Curated annotation (Swiss-Prot):
Protein name: ATP-dependent (S)-NAD(P)H-hydrate dehydratase
Residues where (6S)-NADPHX binds: 153, 206-212, 275
Domain YjeF C-terminal: start-end pairs: 53-344
Catalysed transformations (reactions): (6S)-NADHX + ATP = ADP + phosphate + NADH + H(+); (6S)-NADPHX + ATP = ADP + phosphate + NADPH + H(+)
Cell inner membrane keyword on record: no
Secretion signal, residue range per the UniProt entry: none
UniProt effect for mutating residue 81 to S: In PEBEL2; decreased reaction kinetics for ATP-dependent NAD(P)H-hydrate dehydratase activity; decreased affinity for (6S)-NADHX; changed ATP-dependent NAD(P)H-hydrate dehydratase activity; thermostability assays show that activity is lost at temperatures above 30 degrees Celsius
Gene: NAXD
Positions of ATP binding: 246-250, 265-274
Length: 347
């Protein structure tokens, strides 16, 4: 009886499909057109969602005004830079300036300071990160800073990591927003309690860094077939810290909401573009928190800031690639910040 019932159901289903197909053939568009229409609607919905979120980013951007004084639109500190890695902190700090911060500081190891100073006279460089009193030297600047970017060019020297651990602790005590990238994320993977539950932290891991964090925090491998769920779960496990997983599409979550940034970029993946993202994010986080949830329509200010930084980085990548193709570097991308910012947020 079971076999007959199953066969009967299958026959009935086939009849229904045949009737629907005949009706579509006579009175409606072909099935492939229906599917194409459904896909187009979903794509249009996605584009609309992105545009709505970009509008929230526009809402948090402070207007330029001759009545403001130097420093009002952002004083950002970058913590990182060692003997081996001097480019990353420069990229992050100069990107912060290009996006619209008024002042950009770099707190680096003494060996990195002359090199970073030589890159740009516009950066304020402090050669203190490897000193015995590094935490105190950075802490005394915290009242003057609106946000920290921790990790670019940091390296994994034990003494530097201990100092950065102390800097993160005093920054949390002062309620300073922190963006954590690169080897700052390696430190967090070793000590997740450092930022657990700190709602003014944003983590910006790439695929490898995300996998390491996920395994350290959730004690198991991530589900490669469920990227959205993996980012959501990691954020929740960290106490709803905002997480930005960089990749073909950037996936963002604060443990309650998931956003996807699919702004067009390019197929070029040059080293350093993550530093552009972290530096610009430091500025946007400050602006978003200053603007408050009323300007973000109730959405998380940090999620809105992160979406803006991801969109900007991708747009810079796209514009630079149009000019330079395979030879595109992060310096080419940084040169596009002004035009990309205007295109996304000021048109």
């Amino acid at each position: 009886m079971v076999t007959r019932a199953g066969a009967g159901t299958a026959v009935a289903g086939a009849v229904v499909v045949a009737l629907l197909s005949a009706a579509l053939a006579l009175y409606g568009p072909p099935l492939d057109a229906v599917l194409e229409r459904a896909f187009s609607l979903r794509k249009a919905h996605s584009i609309k969602d992105m545009e709505n979120t970009l509008q929230l980013v526009r809402n948090i951007i402070p207007p330029l005004s001759s009545t403001k004084h130097k420093g009002q639109d952002g004083r950002i500190g970058v913590v990182g830079g060692c003997q081996e890695y001097t480019g990353a902190p420069y990229f992050a700090a100069i990107s912060a300036l290009k996006v619209g911060a008024d002042l950009s500081h770099v707190f680096c190891a003494s060996a990195a300071a002359p090199v970073i100073k030589a890159y740009s006279p516009e950066l304020i460089v402090h050669p203190v990160l490897d000193s015995p009193n590094a935490v105190h030297e950075v802490e005394k600047w915290l009242p003057r800073l609106h946000a920290l970017v921790v990790g670019p060019g940091l390296g994994r020297d034990d003494a530097l990591l201990r100092n950065v651990q102390g800097i993160l602790e005093v920054s949390k005590a002062r309620d300073i927003p922190v963006v954590i990238d690169a080897d700052g994320l390696w430190l967090v993977a070793q000590q997740p309690a450092l930022i657990h539950g700190y709602r003014k932290a944003v983590l910006t891991p790439n695929h490898v860094e995300f996998s390491r964090l996920y395994d350290a925090v959730l004690r198991g491998p991530m589900d490669s077939d469920d990227s959205h769920g993996s980012v959501l779960r990691l954020s929740q496990a960290l106490g709803n810290v905002t997480v930005v997983q960089k990749g073909e599409r950037d996936i963002l979550s604060n443990g309650q909401q998931v956003l996807v940034c699919s702004q067009e970029g390019s197929s070029r993946r040059c080293g350093g573009q993550g530093d552009l993202l972290s530096g610009s994010l430091g500025v946007l986080v400050h602006w978003a928190l200053l603007a408050g949830p009323q300007k973000t329509n109730g959405s998380s200010p940090l999620l809105v800031a992160a979406f803006g930084a991801c969109s900007l980085t991708r747009q810079c990548n796209h514009q630079a690639f149009q000019k330079h193709g395979r030879s595109t570097t992060t310096s080419d991308m940084i040169a596009e910040v002004g035009a990309a910012f205007s295109k996304l947020f000021e048109t």
